[in-house]
Swiss-Prot record:
<keyword id="KW-0963">Cytoplasm</keyword>
<dbReference type="GO" id="GO:0006235">
    <property type="term" value="P:dTTP biosynthetic process"/>
</dbReference>
<dbReference type="InterPro" id="IPR036926">
    <property type="entry name" value="Thymidate_synth/dCMP_Mease_sf"/>
</dbReference>
<dbReference type="Pfam" id="PF00303">
    <property type="entry name" value="Thymidylat_synt"/>
</dbReference>
<dbReference type="GO" id="GO:0005829">
    <property type="term" value="C:cytosol"/>
</dbReference>
<comment type="pathway">
    <text>Pyrimidine metabolism; dTTP biosynthesis.</text>
</comment>
<dbReference type="GO" id="GO:0006231">
    <property type="term" value="P:dTMP biosynthetic process"/>
</dbReference>
<dbReference type="InterPro" id="IPR000398">
    <property type="entry name" value="Thymidylate_synthase"/>
</dbReference>
<feature type="binding site">
    <location>
        <position position="191"/>
    </location>
    <ligand>
        <name>dUMP</name>
    </ligand>
</feature>
<feature type="binding site">
    <location>
        <begin position="221"/>
        <end position="223"/>
    </location>
    <ligand>
        <name>dUMP</name>
    </ligand>
</feature>
<keyword id="KW-0489">Methyltransferase</keyword>
<feature type="active site" description="Nucleophile">
    <location>
        <position position="160"/>
    </location>
</feature>
<feature type="binding site">
    <location>
        <position position="183"/>
    </location>
    <ligand>
        <name>(6R)-5,10-methylene-5,6,7,8-tetrahydrofolate</name>
    </ligand>
</feature>
<dbReference type="InterPro" id="IPR045097">
    <property type="entry name" value="Thymidate_synth/dCMP_Mease"/>
</dbReference>
<comment type="subunit">
    <text>Homodimer.</text>
</comment>
<keyword id="KW-0545">Nucleotide biosynthesis</keyword>
<feature type="binding site">
    <location>
        <position position="282"/>
    </location>
    <ligand>
        <name>(6R)-5,10-methylene-5,6,7,8-tetrahydrofolate</name>
    </ligand>
</feature>
Amino acid sequence: MKQYLDLCQRLIDEGTWVENSRTGKRCLTVINADLVYHVDKNEFPLITTRKSFYKAAIAELLGYIRGYDNAADFRAIGCNTWNANANDNQAWLDNPHRKGIDDMGRVYGVQGRAWSKPDGGCIDQLRKIVDDLSKGIDDRGEILSFYNPGEFHMGCLRPCMHTHNFSLVGDTLHLTSFQRSCDVPLGLNFNQVQVFTLLALMAQITGHKPGTAFHKIVNAHIYEDQLELMQEVQLKREPFTSPKLVINPNIKSLEDLETWVSIDDFEVTGYEHHEAISYPFSV
């Protein structure tokens, strides 16, 4: 929790004002932010200086694991984050690759489970990683990437958190996740929950101990209309101890994650928090 608040303070103290052409707003921006999550100690990085929610973040992660390309599928498992991108983005609505209502195109999990090969067919990146790690293999290329510039025009949104690199040392699994851009007051809580949970799940289904998750953010920013709430409310609150994440121990394989697992198989315990803060969201 301290590292999150330190990053927020760093944005205020060291950030440079940058005009964002997409939103028409200014952002205080810093380049390169490194966060570390101790999955081995089960220190779940759910923000405590405001009431935060984890279920939609984990549901979205499940959708990525399953390779979903439709907002309706995400809604069915408890995640509404793709509704607007799939249905209210005019550029995507006009795109000839859009298949209809709720279609997201070739984004995130589609790339992770069915990356197109130039000679035909596709690569299931996640399946390869799970198979290797289950056999105790780390070829120094256990990389799950959603970032495919050759198919950006075939999807509604470029990935923000785009690459997950797994490393097996002895019987302990580690993860390094890369993110190109992050709205710190709103988006980071969502993202860090996913990084933590992804490592915990992958360790569980491949039979290894979870280690450390390293989260690398390139462009970390706070929008001008979020600044006052961050300075005058959230940063003046004392954080509570991190809660714990409890995952159903019956989840034992990638096939389990693809089929019967739901958000009800995840529980957060010991979560103390301050009141919610309604930060403005920039579309």
